[in-house]
Amino acid sequence: FSTLGSALAITNLTSVLESDGPFTVFAPTNDAFADFLTANGFASLEEVPVDVLASTLLNHVVGGVNNAADLTTRYINTSASFNAEPDAPLSMYVNTTEGVMLNGMSSVTTADVSADNGVIHIVDAVITLPTVVTFAAADAATFSELVGALTRADQPDYLSVLTTANGIEPAPFTVFAPTNQAFADLYAELGVAGIDDVDGGVLTATLNTHVIAGANVRAEDLVSGSVTTLGDALEIDATTAIITDPNGRTSQVIVTNVQAANGVIHAIDTVLLPQL
């Protein structure tokens, strides 16, 4: 773990992880860091912007002691945060279906290495700062239909847009993300077999209606009233967390504040439709 130690020293985070904690640290191997540097075009750790490196390291740290037996498939908060805002911790998607997979990109290879102030799990890849696409792709049990819609061949290049880094327009994003069940209900409502049977123009307008550009609106910051999306305007009742589309159809926010580095996702139980 010499590379991890060097990274902590460069970012002045060594003292943080030597404090009382307790912490759960997902620790990348030297090979994992080498792969990370190569994939991102860096010749050395020193070439990585210090703020990016610090955020990336904090994205591997979770408060409290989480032994392998305590980890379940769910979202947890890391010690990294959106735009360095302490009230907007970055999420991590833990999938324990087969072993322990983090954000769909890094697997625990050795678990439960005891430390004086917590526990360490060794991982085989650096957990890069997540985008809203990271979570949609990693959480296939919830969002695979949404990803299928976003990546349909006749659609705009949504994945490129939605991976735009914070600080570069049109990021950040607030995404109201329909679940797989929401899409199943939509297909029944429209009388179609699946996403491939939805008209291309309608699909584009529909997807656009689920995205607010230029704002990271967490659940606690939602206000009642009309909100402008990339598509049609929506009406939000912040008290009940119900969203009404232009057709009077309603959707309930069922999971809030899945926080990425370039925006936030709120899962909803009904697909919102543009004015039909």
Give each language-model segment a name.
Residues 1-276:
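Mature, structured domains of secreted/extracytosolic soluble proteins
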